[in-house]
């Protein structure tokens, strides 16, 4: 990602459209606390990058809005995780000890899919569906998605693809691979994809993640062993390493947005 030639970030920044090749453009930003003097940034910890913002003169208020929206979504996610905690048979504060503003690796992505007369070539799935983004699992704890009301998402259930209803008055909540991992697949991370729709639309996913050094020991919720096909706990893994491996696999499979 980049805003200009000086941006050396791996993730944060602007991913531009490329005429004749790529129509989608996006802007990614992460924890606003990740400044150059943040201890994890200072020592070069992977996935810790200061955000690169467009000029305030050219885009007045953009940065302040984005940072405010990030923390609003963080607070919403904190409340959602209380519900997940209770559903897992834990105290509602279970995730509070892992999900902190100071070190969260959560990221926000602003994605624009444009309406074009001459759209660049798009990928086609084996079933003939034209794709805006191929099938994948979200590399996150959970994902909180806002999108404009243009139907495009599909979820895979029993080898069949189903359209996901869309609305600009609701958030769509999805379980990511880390939630699946720490609950031994009790909360399944669904495979999903984005259909190609030649229409102007926006997609704003907030990928919820805990800190890099965080380790949540996997567990099977009490009383669920009968319906859960996985009986052995996954081995503990440092969250940052889990994310790095997941992101690398996602880029290899589908490329960058």
Give each language-model segment a name.
Residues 1-257:
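Peripheral, non-catalytic segments flanking oxidoreductase cores
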């Amino acid at each position: 990602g980049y805003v200009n030639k000086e941006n050396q970030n791996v993730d944060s920044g602007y991913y531009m459209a490329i005429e004749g090749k790529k129509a989608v453009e996006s802007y990614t930003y992460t924890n606003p606390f990740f400044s150059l003097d943040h201890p994890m940034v200072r020592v070069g910890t992977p996935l810790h990058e200061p955000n690169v913002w467009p000029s305030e003169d050219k885009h007045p208020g953009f940065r302040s809005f984005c940072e405010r929206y990030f923390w609003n979504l963080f607070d919403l996610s904190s409340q959602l995780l209380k519900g997940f905690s209770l559903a897992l048979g834990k105290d509602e504060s279970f995730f509070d000890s892992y999900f902190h503003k100071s070190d969260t690796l959560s990221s926000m992505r602003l994605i624009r899919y444009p309406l074009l007369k001459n759209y660049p070539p798009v990928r086609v799935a084996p079933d003939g569906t034209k794709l805006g983004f191929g099938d994948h699992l979200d590399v996150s704890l959970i994902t909180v998605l806002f999108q404009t009301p243009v139907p495009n998402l599909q979820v895979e259930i029993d080898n069949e693809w189903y359209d996901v209803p869309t609305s600009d008055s609701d958030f769509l909540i999805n379980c990511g691979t880390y939630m699946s991992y720490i609950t031994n697949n009790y909360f399944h991370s669904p495979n999903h994809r984005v259909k190609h729709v030649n229409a102007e639309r926006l997609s704003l996913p907030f990928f919820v993640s805990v800190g890099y050094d965080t380790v949540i020991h996997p567990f099977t919720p009490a009383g669920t062993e009968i319906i859960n096909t996985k009986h052995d706990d996954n081995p503990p893994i440092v969250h940052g390493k889990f994310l790095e491996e997941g992101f690398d696999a996602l880029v290899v499979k589908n490329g960058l947005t």
